[in-house]
Structure formats: C-alpha cells, structure tokens
C-alpha cells in the first residue's frame, strides 16, 4: 500500500460553546467552566488508543471542530498536538485546522495556536448581515467578524470563512453582494452551508421556495467561477 493510501486525518471535537445557535445540531453544550487539563488528559488517552490501531500510518490532516475550539487555551492545543506528533508521522504538507467563532478571537491566543502548530483557521462568520446574524443566534457583530478576519490573517497564511446561504428573505442581489464582500477580505478559502440543510431549534425560520434556493445555489457557483 502506498504512503498516500495509508495517509489519514484526525478530527478532534471540542463540544463547548458560549451559547447554542438555533440551527446547530452538532454535539455542543454551553458550559460556564471547563476543566481543560482533564480534557487534555482525555484527548491524550484517545490519541494513544487510536495510535495503537493506526501504527505506521501518515497523518495528513488534523481538524479541531466543535463546539467552539477557539475557546480552548493555547496550552491545551499545544498539549494535544504534542501527543499527535509523538504518535504519528506527519505529512510534510499536513494541514492543521482550528475552527473559531469571531467573538472568541484574540490575537494573543491565535499566536499561541500558531506556535502550537495550527496552520489554518476556519472562521464561523455565517453572515455579513446584522439582522441575519441575530436570526441565526450568532453572538458576534459584522464589525467583530471583520476584526476577527484581520486578526486571523495577521497570524495565519490560510484563513477560511463560512457563510450560510438561502437564508430567510435573502435575495439573489443580497447574496451576490455578500459573496463580493467576502471575497474582498482576501481569505484563502470560502466555505458555504445552505440553510435548507440546517435544522433550526426552538423557533421556526421560514425557508425559501425550492426554486429560489436553486437560483441562489446557481448564483453562488457562477459568481465564484467568475471571481
């Protein structure tokens, strides 16, 4: 078996958030206090367990998801990645990603993540419209989103942002404008999630017609190809 065929990725889940977004059906929980040393010990034990089953394999991706991984202390991320490096051979071009929410972005913490080995940050912007941010239950503002992107770009070469499309009352013109503004940030990658596939909790958010959703999706594809 070739080295490429034996390569694999590791996903590390940090399940804690400052609040629960209404569309989120991931394993995430609001906690006022988290014993990060205990969680580091648990991560290390799980890495050891999986490492014993994957001996000799090459690691080409590591992804910290959540939840809100940017609530982790840099020392916790450092400890996890130290155990990862001690357990597996890392590919020369290994991508080590950490998801972050704009409201929990701090330059000093990001610098600590970079020293630990993080080389890509994915920012959960979700929308550049204040009303939509409120409807989506997001805690950050558009200004905080812009600031977070700037901080991330000052530390990391690879920064991506997530946007949710086909949102309630969103027009094609508004989506085109939002895509244009997102690309103006100069991020390395733009990821999108469509609202039709997200489950909303506690309150109903009226969805678009199927025809309007498809038009939005086509607009996204055509716009990104042209830019």
PLM segments and residue spans:
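N-terminal [4Fe-4S]-dependent radical SAM core
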Residues: 1-10, 55-57
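Sequence-level motif detector for i,i+2 pairs with an aromatic at +2
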Residues: 5-7, 21, 59, 93
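Short beta-strand motif preference
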Residues: 10-12, 123
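Local cysteine-cluster metal-coordination motifs and their immediate loop/turn environment
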Residues: 13-28
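Conserved non-cysteine loop/helix-boundary elements of the Radical SAM core domain that shape
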Residues: 28-53, 57-226
